[in-house]
């Protein structure tokens, strides 16, 4: 699973997921399913905000990354992917600027057009069950919830899906592709079932022992762009360059 994640997600997303797991004291070598889930969630959050801007009239518009008007205000502020201290700093700044009610839990995005925080969910189960779990945890009508599944289903607060159909279709297609790629590698069942995950972990550990040399070499690969992209991500003036450059899963 770890190899799959490193092959199928942008290196920047992988790095952010690694930092998140380290912050919570989790070992990605053991919690490989969580590693994959975090990367998937991060990518959905990025794709959710891709190309969406607000023009001078306050209207939401879609602009491709090569468009010269890309200096327009981003519609969404991405909170997910930052360390907790920085994330809460961003949330507090938004609340002070917009007058929005401070959420009890860290949300994933802020929508400047609708003036609301958004909680994004990606589930391997039934969307309505996961939605209810999220709603019960958050217990706030101010935070908008939007759930996606790997089967193409979605559910949102008051059936308000925020994005246009094409943008949501991109997310659904990507999730379906991830599912297919996992299935082709025999990883999907373990990703869905904790019991199967334990079996897969034993296989992975055994495989790592047999070919430790090659895996160590692969795990150390770095992208020259990371040092350039990181400040772009942490700075509020991030661009669509990173978010539009997601790597496609290589064929098995």
Curated annotation (Swiss-Prot):
Main localization of the protein described in the UniProt heading: host cell
Q: Where in the cell is it found?
A: Host cytoplasm; Host nucleus
| Site (described: Important for efficient shutoff activity) | 202-203, 206
Q: Which UniProt keywords apply?
A: Decay of host mRNAs by virus, Eukaryotic host gene expression shutoff by virus, Host cytoplasm, Host gene expression shutoff by virus, Host mRNA suppression by virus, Host nucleus, Host-virus interaction
List GO BP terms, alphabetically. Answer: viral RNA genome replication; viral translational frameshifting
Question: Which stretch is the leader sequence?
Answer: none
Listed GO MF terms: RNA binding
Q: Which Pfam families match?
A: Flu_PA
Annotated site (Important for efficient shutoff activity and nuclear localization): 195, 198-199
**Where are the active-site residues found?**
80, 108
Q: State the function annotated in the UniProt record.
A: Plays a major role in the shutoff of the host protein expression by cleaving mRNAs probably via an endonuclease activity. This host shutoff allows the virus to escape from the host antiviral response. Hijacks host RNA splicing machinery to selectively target host RNAs containing introns for destruction. This may explain the preferential degradation of RNAs that have undergone co- or post-transcriptional processing.
Q: What is known of its domains?
A: The probable endonuclease active site in the N-terminus and the basic amino acid cluster in the C-terminus are important for the shutoff activity. The C-terminus acts as a nuclear localization signal. The C-terminus is recruited to host protein complexes involved in nuclear Pol II RNA processing.
Q: Which family does it belong to?
A: Belongs to the influenza viruses PA-X family.
Q: What is this protein called?
A: Protein PA-X
Species in which this protein is naturally found: Influenza A virus (strain A/USA:Memphis/10/1996 H1N1)
């Amino acid at each position: 699973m770890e190899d799959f994640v490193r092959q199928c997600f942008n290196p920047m997303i992988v790095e952010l997921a690694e930092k998140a797991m380290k912050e919570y004291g989790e070992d990605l070598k053991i919690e490989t399913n969580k590693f994959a889930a975090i990367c998937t969630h991060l990518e959905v959050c990025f794709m959710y905000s891709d190309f969406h801007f607000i023009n001078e009239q306050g209207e939401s518009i879609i602009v491709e990354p090569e468009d010269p008007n890309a200096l327009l205000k981003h519609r969404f502020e991405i909170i997910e992917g930052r360390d907790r201290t920085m994330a809460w700093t961003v949330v507090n700044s938004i609340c002070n600027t917009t007058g929005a009610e401070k959420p009890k839990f860290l949300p994933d995005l802020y929508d400047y057009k609708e003036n609301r925080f958004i909680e994004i969910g990606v589930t391997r189960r039934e969307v309505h069950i996961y939605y209810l779990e999220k709603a019960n945890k958050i217990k706030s009508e101010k935070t908008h919830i939007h759930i996606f599944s790997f089967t193409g289903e979605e559910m949102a607060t008051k059936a308000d899906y925020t994005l246009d159909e094409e943008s949501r279709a991109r997310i659904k297609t990507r999730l379906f592709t991830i599912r297919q790629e996992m299935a082709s590698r025999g990883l999907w069942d373990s990703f869905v079932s904790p019991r199967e995950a334990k079996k897969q972990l034993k296989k992975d550990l055994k495989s790592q022992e047999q070919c430790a040399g090659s895996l160590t070499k692969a795990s150390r690969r770095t992208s020259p762009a990371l040092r350039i992209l990181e400040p772009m991500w942490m700075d509020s003036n991030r661009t669509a360059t990173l978010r539009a450059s997601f790597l496609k899963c290589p064929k098995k």
